[in-house]
Structure formats: structure tokens, C-alpha cells
């Protein structure tokens, strides 16, 4: 489908906000005696976590989880499957889930349930982009980069049909008729 990309959040705005998020996260966890582990939900959050982890000024670990709720189609089945599980044990650690974008929150809510069973000391969420008007479940997001309207976004790791992850900014996809 033909489309164009309109810049919504510039590379400079992303850099400034990621730096601020790093400072907020550092402040929250700097006095904790328990380790902090950042968990990136792949694939979309890989660029965000790469930049964010360098802005957090306390010792931390990083791990990755890949989930799927789409089966073979483009509509979520609601059944969350873990494609790649964590390598690290999160028992008694401060866990910070790092997301690229949160809309309905259904998949994230199920991931939270799975991780809670592993008894972390704390479980928090950081997202680059939040679409609060799309929320279908009640979840508390501790750190939000940008609240955005319900529009299709790409760039900075977020894709459209596996394209546009490389863009250094967040852009809105405008479909042409």
C-alpha cells in the first residue's frame, strides 16, 4: 500500500527524552540494594533499550524476551506465546520492562503476569511511546517517553512490515488512497 512518512518526534527530541528517562530511572533505583535488570520486549524496543541503557548511571543487567500474540495474521489472537524467554533469573531483582510502544496493553499485561510468577523484588514498566486512548486493560506505566494519538508509527526500532526500523526519528505512516 502506498504511503508516506511524516516526522512526529525528531531525532533530537528522542535523544533529549531518552536522556531524561535515564535520569528518572537512575534516581528511582540508585539507593536499591537489589540489582536492576532491564528486560527489552523484542523486536521493536531494541533501539530504545540500546540508547536508554547508556543513560542509566547505575549498574544494571539487560535481558531480552520475545513474545507473539499474532499467530500468522495481523490481528492479535490474545494468546501470548513466549518465543524467546529470559536468560537471567529475575528472582528478588528490580525488573524494568522496556517497551517500544503500548497500545491496548493486552500482551504486556500477560507478560507482567508471567514475570510476577518469578518473584522479582519489583516490576516496573518503561515505554518510549504510549497510546493511552487505546488501552483495554489497566496497567501502570512508570516511565513514559511520549504520549501519542492512535496513529500508525514507525522508526527508532518500530517497523511497518519489517521496514523503517532504521529511521532515527518517529514518523507517522500516512496511507494514500
Swiss-Prot record:
UniProt-recorded Gene Ontology molecular function terms: guanine phosphoribosyltransferase activity; hypoxanthine phosphoribosyltransferase activity; magnesium ion binding; nucleotide binding
Presence of keyword Metal-binding: yes
Positions annotated to bind GMP: 99, 103-108, 131, 159
Binding site for Mg(2+): 99-100
Cofactors, names only: Mg(2+)
Record's subunit section: Homotetramer.
Alphabetic keyword roster: Cytoplasm, Glycosyltransferase, Magnesium, Metal-binding, Nucleotide-binding, Purine salvage, Transferase
Domain of life of the organism encoding this protein: Bacteria
Example GO biological process: GMP salvage
Provenance organism: Buchnera aphidicola subsp. Schizaphis graminum (strain Sg)
GO annotation, cellular component aspect: cytosol
Gene3D superfamilies: 3.40.50.2020
Places the protein is found: Cytoplasm
Alphabetical list of InterPro entries matching this protein: HGPRT, Hxn_phspho_trans, PRibTrfase_dom, PRTase-like
Residues annotated as the enzyme's active site: 103 (proton acceptor)
Protein name per UniProt: Hypoxanthine phosphoribosyltransferase
TM ranges: none
Family stated for the protein in its record: Belongs to the purine/pyrimidine phosphoribosyltransferase family.
Uppermost EC category: transferase
PANTHER family xrefs: HYPOXANTHINE PHOSPHORIBOSYLTRANSFERASE, HYPOXANTHINE-GUANINE PHOSPHORIBOSYLTRANSFERASE
Free-text function comment from the UniProt entry: Purine salvage pathway enzyme which catalyzes the transfer of the ribosyl-5-phosphate group from 5-phospho-alpha-D-ribose 1-diphosphate (PRPP) to the N9 position of hypoxanthine to yield IMP (inosine 5'-monophosphate). To a lesser extent, can also act on guanine leading to GMP, but shows a highly less efficient activity with xanthine.
Pathway note: Purine metabolism; IMP biosynthesis via salvage pathway; IMP from hypoxanthine: step 1/1
Binding site for diphosphate: 43-44, 165
SUPFAM superfamilies per record: PRTase-like (SSF53271)
Enzymatic reactions: IMP + diphosphate = hypoxanthine + 5-phospho-alpha-D-ribose 1-diphosphate; GMP + diphosphate = guanine + 5-phospho-alpha-D-ribose 1-diphosphate
Amino acid at each position: 500500500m502506498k504511503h508516506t512518512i511524516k516526522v512526529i518526534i525528531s531525532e533530537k527530541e528522542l535523544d533529549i527524552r531518552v536522556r531524561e528517562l535515564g535520569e528518572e530511572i537512575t534516581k528511582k533505583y540508585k539507593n536499591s540494594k537489589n540489582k536492576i535488570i532491564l528486560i527489552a520486549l523484542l523486536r521493536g524496543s531494541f533501539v530504545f533499550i540500546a540508547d536508554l541503557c547508556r543513560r542509566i548511571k547505575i549498574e544494571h543487567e539487560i535481558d531480552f524476551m520475545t513474545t507473539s500474540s499474532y499467530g500468522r495474521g495481523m490481528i492479535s489472537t490474545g494468546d501470548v506465546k513466549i518465543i524467546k524467554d529470559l536468560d537471567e533469573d529475575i528472582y528478588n531483582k528490580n525488573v524494568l520492562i522496556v517497551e517500544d510502544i503500548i497500545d491496548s496493553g493486552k500482551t504486556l499485561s500477560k507478560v507482567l503476569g508471567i514475570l510476577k510468577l518469578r518473584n522479582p523484588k519489583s516490576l516496573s514498566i518503561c515505554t518510549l511511546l504510549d497510546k493511552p486512548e487505546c488501552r483495554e486493560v489497566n496497567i501502570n506505566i512508570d516511565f513514559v517517553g511520549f504520549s501519542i494519538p492512535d496513529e500508525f508509527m514507525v522508526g527508532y526500532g518500530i517497523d511497518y512490515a519489517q521496514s523503517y526500523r532504521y529511521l532515527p526519528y518517529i514518523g507517522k505512516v500516512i496511507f494514500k488512497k
